[in-house]
């Protein structure tokens, strides 16, 4: 399974576009996941880019058909994200994804995978470095800049921002900066998606008390091992 995924990722990575392919941004989306039992809850929020007012929200619950495998998170979470985004009536001009973009060993983290699958501009935002090293504020992998660190709050650890698909390096950083609303550390669309996914998770648990949160989930990856 891993060998197959690796070969597919290497092929897909060649299709990733790291340049701006979008017009003026009016709507920005954020997506985050929660887990209950063996199901993935994917929540997507669409906000007005200037005001961060919520325009639309959707969610989906999909069975996780692939186990958690470090650096292959896309095969576990992307199907739920794609289904949730496809339910939207108002499509975002750019989608912010809780995970890595090209700052990934094979240049195709969750944000890149989702961007390719949906053919939309995406940006990855993670809370820990997956691979490479930091030089000043740049994420450098194999002597190539793959993204940037971003400190959004005083005394807070940085976020790791990288293009997913159809967004350039500098634009990725600027878009994420524009989506920060203190006191929240992470971009507002992802913050809201996180809250929404958690709300759905609790509702599902209340309907079926035997369901339990899956503690070995993507938050480990979001921490460092996508």
Spans of features found by a protein language model:
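C-terminal binding/interaction regions
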Residues: 1-19, 57, 78, 83, ...
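Signal-transducing coiled-coil linker helices
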Residues: 21-25
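Two-metal-ion RNase H-like nuclease active-site motif
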Residues: 26-36
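A glycine-rich, hydrophobic loop/mini-helix early in the fold
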Residues: 36-91
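Flexible, glycine/proline-enriched loop segments at strand-loop-helix junctions
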Residues: 68-71, 98-105, 157-163
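Catalytic-site beta-strand/loop segments enriched in glycine and acidic/polar residues
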Residues: 82-114, 118-120
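Acidic, glycine-rich active-site loops and adjacent beta-strand->loop/helix elements
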Residues: 99-102, 126-131
